[in-house]
Amino acid sequence: ITFFFARLETETSIITRRGVVIHGRAVLAGRLASTMRRKTTEFIGNNIKYFIIAPLLTIAESSTELLLPFLMGRIVDDGLNAENSRNVLYIGLWMIGISLLGLLLGIFSARTSAKASQGYGFNLRQAMFRQIQTFSFADIDTFSTASLVNRCTMDIRQIQDAVMQIIRMLVRAPTLLIVSMVICIRLHAGLSIVYWLAIPALLATLFVIMRITKPFFSAMRTRSDALNACVQENMIAIRVVKTFVRSNYEKEKFRRANDALTDTSIGASIRIALMHPCSTVIFNLATIALYWFGGHLVGSGALLSGALLSYVAYLNNILFSVMMFNMVLTRLSRTKPCLTRCMEVLNYESSIRSENGGEPSSMQGAIRFEHVSFSYPGAQRSGSVLEDICISVKPGEFIAVVGPTGVGKTTFVNLIPRFYDPVEGRIFIDGKELRTWDLGSLRQHIGVVLQNNILFSGTVRDNLRWGAPTATDEELLEAARDAQAHEFILHLPDGLDTVIEQGGTNVSGGQRQRLCIARALLKKPCILILDDSTSALDSITERRIFDTFYQKYRNTTILLVAQRISSVQNADRIIVLDGCRICAVGTHAELLQNCGIYQAIYDSQQEGSEADGGRRQ
C-alpha cells in the first residue's frame, strides 16, 4: 500500500502553511513516500491482524484455484481417455472438495479484507476530522466547506476500496501468475511462447487505455466538489432562493454542474470500457493459438489432451492475473486524486497553532491592540481590512464597536479569540501576547456569539451545555433567564428536552439569538464577544439583556458589535471604525459632540425612527 500510494504521488502537489501550492517530482516523491509510510502505519492501527491474515487466506484461496486445472487434465487423461469411470468419480470428488474449500477460504478472505479496509478508512476519517478541527477560520477559507465534506466522505471511500483491492488482488494476481507460468513451462516449454507474446500485447493495450483515462479521474473529483458546493449552497440558502423566486436559476446552475460531472464521468467510463473488449480479443487470440499449436502436439503424441486443457486454463490464469494487476492500477489511478486531496488536508500546517504556553487558572480580561493590521488571505489587492489599530480595554469594561458596513467590526473582535492572526502588530490579553497563550485555555475564557447564530441538532439542553457539559439544569435556566430565553424555553412542548432541528430551523431568529447568548453566558467567560447578536430582538428584550449585563456581569469584559445606536449608548466606551481604522473612541455623549461619523449614524437612525412613527400614525 505504501509503495503504490507513494509512487502514484510523484507528480502531486501539497499545500504549505501559507496556502502556496508547490510542485515537484523527485523531492516531493520522497517527502510523500516518507509521509505515506508514517501515515499508513498510523491508519492500519489495531487492524494489523486483518492486514496479515487476509493476504494469507488469499494465497490459500488462490492455491485451490491452481489445483483445479491440474485435476481437470487428470480427469481427461486418466478418466475419460482411459475409460476409467472410477478415476472420473474419484478426481471429480476431489475437485468438488477443493472448490468448497476455496469457497470457504474466499469468504473468510473477503471478510478479513473488508475488516482491514474498513478499519483503515475509519482511522483515516478520524485523522482527517481531527486535523480539520485544528484549522483556523483562514484555513477553512483555504478549502471550501463542500470540498472538505467530500474529502472526508467520498474520497476516503475511494481510498478504502483501493485498500480492499490491493489486499485481495495484489496478493492473488502474483500467486496465480507465477505458479501458472511455472506449471505451463513444466507441461510444455515450447507452448509458453504463446503467453510470452500475449502478455506484452495485453500490457501495451492496458497502458494506453490507462494513459488516456487518467486525466478524467482528477477532473471528476474537481467537478464532484463543484456539484456538492452547488447543492450545499442551495440547501443553506433555500429560503432566499424561494423568496427571490430563483429556483429556475438554481436549477440551471445545478444542471450545468451536473452536466460537467456527467460528461467527465462518461468520458472516463467510455475509455475504461475499452479494456474488456480489447482484453477479450487478446484472450481469444491466445486461446486459438494455443489450441492450434497444442492440437498438433496432441496429434503427434507429444502432448496429452488433458494436459492441453490444463495448459489453456493456466494460460487464462496468467492473462487474468495481468488483468488483475491492471484493475489494481486503474483503481489506484482513480484513487490518486482522492489521496492527494486527503494528504493536502493531513499535511496542511494550520496558520494558528497553540504554543502550549501553560494554562492560566484565571483571566482578568484586559485587552490591548498594538498597531494591529489585518487582511484576509488572497485579498491583498483589495487592501487591509484593519490598519494600525491601537486600543486598550480594561477588565470589566463594556465596549461597543460601531461603524459603517464593511469597515472590519467583525474582523476586529474575531482577532481576540485568535480565529485569525494579525498580519502586523500584536494583541495582548492580561499583558500576555496572544500567540503565547494556550489556544484551548484562551478560548475557554472567551464567550463568543457570532453573527450567524448556529444551533446544533439535539435538545435545547444539549445546545446550552455546548460550552459547559457539566452544567446543572438550574445553571442552564439561570443563563437562559439572563439571556431572556427562560420564558420561551418553558413554553416549548418539552422545555429543555425540546429537540432543535439542524441549524435551529424550528425556532425563530430572536429565539436562536437568545439561546446562543445563554450558551455563551453558561461558560462564565472572562471576555464576552457579541457580534451583532441582538439584531433580531425587539428593543425591550434587548434592553433587559443589557441591563442584566450591566448589573450582573460587571467583572466580565464585554465587546458588542452593533448597528443600532440604541444598543450601544450605555456602553462604557464606544469604538468607531471607519476606513479600516479607529477614528474615535468615547462615550455616547462625547461622540455626539466630537465624531461626525457617529453623529451621522445617530441622526440617520433617529430620522428613520421618526419616519416610521409618522407612517404608523
Give residue ranges: language-model regions.
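Short intracellular "coupling" helices and adjacent cytoplasmic loop segments at the cytosolic face
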Residues: A82, Q118, Q126-N150, M154-I156, ...
